[in-house]
Structure formats: structure tokens, C-alpha cells
Amino acid sequence: MRRLLFANFAALAFVIAGSAIAADLPLKAPVPFAERFSWTSCHLGGHIGGGFGKKDITDPVQLAQDSFLGAGFTTGITTISPEPTGIVIGGQIGCDYQFASSPFVIGIEGAGSGSTMRGSRTAVLPLGNPGIALVQANTDFLPSLTARLGYAFDNVLLYAKGGVALAGDKFEVSGSFAATPFDFRGLDNRLGWSVGAGGEWAFSRHWSAFIEYDYYQFGHSNILMSDGINGFSGLVDVRQNVQVVKGGFNFHVWGAGL
């Protein structure tokens, strides 16, 4: 009996001592909760890319020939389509909001791009014995104001966008008619619309990189062309669109990871 009581007492003492030692040990730190990434922030940044445009110009042949010969001499309609290409470079500023407990993101962004897009085509002037005209079209700048809707996969955002856009264009029809030089020039700042899509990756708390495709449509309008050599003037109809692929970086002012 004594041995049994002693054994029970020893076991109880061992358990109590073990509990006391365990109570003195530091608690294991809790595993920190990983916060969900949020795209709610404002941003500013820069971009660079390439642009391709199509400009259907009607009718540079009639413009040149009828300026020298008088209205009605040119028969038929001629459309010349320079296709300007070049570099676009600029900046953007905007704000985004990600809905709570949701992957959906809405935002607004203003962007402006300078452009080196240039294109030219030649046209024959059959009544000029014959003559040749060089038809040129340039796009100098492309600002836009767009809304965007995105779907976030944590720190990766896929989005579509759309809004209003402006194109700053220059047009020139130059050459000679019956050995007489001419040089018609015109300017056009045209309002249109733009749609696009892209992807953005936030690689740190404040910085992200993106790639984007944009399509611009500016419809058609009449452009006044003036010849500074001979004092002629006339109208051409221009229908145009522009496509741009660009990439860039954004700095998120409030931190994309807030």
C-alpha cells in the first residue's frame, strides 16, 4: 500500500511540476493575418509605345486641279490614305477604387501623349500634264480622359477602359501642276472616342508596371487647306482612326497596398 501511495504521489508531483514549467514558457507568437491587397489609390506616371493610324483623305486631286483650273474640271473622286506610324510618349494621372471584399475596381484616368506619327502617299494629277502631289498626314498629340473597370487578382489588375479623346493633326498636299508649285496645309484638332484594355502589376507598395492597347476613332470632318504659294484654299474630307500599344510605370501616391 505504501509503495502504491508513494507512486501515485510521485506521479502527481511530476504532473504539477510540468504544468508549472509550461506556464513559465513564453507563448508562441500568433501567425500574422495577411492583408488583402487593395488597388484603392491615386497614381501618376509615364508611358512610351508605338502608334499606327489610318487617314482617308478625299479629295486631294480635286483640291489641286480645281484650284488651278476652276471648279468642275476634275471628274471622279480620289481618296488617298496615308498611314502614319511613329512613337508615342507621355504621362497619365488617375485614381482607382476597389470595392470592399470584392475583386472589382473602378477608376478614372487622364492621359496625354506626344507623337512622332508621320505618313505620306503620292497622287497623280492627270490634268497637270500630268502632275504629282505628295499627300502627308501627321498626328502630333493624343490626350484622353477615360473611365476604367478592372478585375483584380491580388496585385495584378486586368481592365478595360473607354472615354473621350482628342487628336492634333497636320495635313499637307504639295507638288506641282503644269510646272507650277503648290503647297496646301491644314490643321485639325478633332474630338473623338477611345476604348482600350490592359494589365497592371503592382510590384511594390507604391510602384506598378502596365501594358495597354488603345483604339481611337475620330470619324470624319472637312479640313480647310490653304496654299501659301498661290493663295488658293479648299476643303478635303478626312476620316481617321489611331491604334496605340504602350507600356509604362505608375507611382501610387497613397500606396497601392493600403
Segments from the language model and where they lie:
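Gram-negative outer-membrane beta-barrel domains
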Residues: 2-258
